[in-house]
Regions:
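Short loop-to-alpha-helix "cap/lid" segments that border enzyme active sites
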Residues: 1-105, 109-141
Length: 141
């Protein structure tokens, strides 16, 4: 990330705190780790607010081991802290609309074109041809 000047354009995530530990405090944008998400979940249940999170994004799934995750409550709780909520993996347009309307900032999908269509945006072109041939792809703005 540093070699490509991408430190401020990429959010690094891991379920494990120990994987993110070497990056903390070094200017990298990080997602909440699993223990941080569990602490946030406890704060939702006890109505205590988000506190002062040490991460710059919260990336969660709507279901974890068959249990619903309160993603809309996470989004409402984190928005005043300036922390976006990303949800994965959502492929259903109705669910995506409900999540966006509820304050979720981003959706990771197996079908990004369908998600863009749900937002009323045209599908973007695929990756540049040169990236499929093994030659370096052009840099995007």
């Amino acid at each position: 990330l540093e070699a490509h000047g991408a430190r401020e354009r990429v959010v690094v995530g891991s379920f494990r705190d120990e994987a993110l530990a070497p990056l903390r405090g070094r200017g990298f944008l990080l997602t909440a780790s699993r223990p941080e998400v569990l602490r946030l979940y406890a704060r939702v249940l006890t109505l205590r607010g988000a506190g002062t999170p040490a991460y710059q994004a919260c990336s969660v799934t709507p279901w974890f081991h068959g249990l619903p995750v309160p993603v809309l409550q996470f989004a409402r709780m984190l928005r005043p802290c300036g922390i976006p909520t990303h949800i994965w993996t959502v492929n259903d347009a109705r669910q995506a609309r409900r999540l966006w309307a509820g304050g979720v900032n981003a959706i990771l999908s197996d079908d990004p074109g369908a998600m863009l269509g749900t937002l009323g945006r045209p599908e973007r072109a695929g990756p540049p041809v040169e990236s499929r041939t093994g030659r370096p792809a052009r840099r995007l703005p």
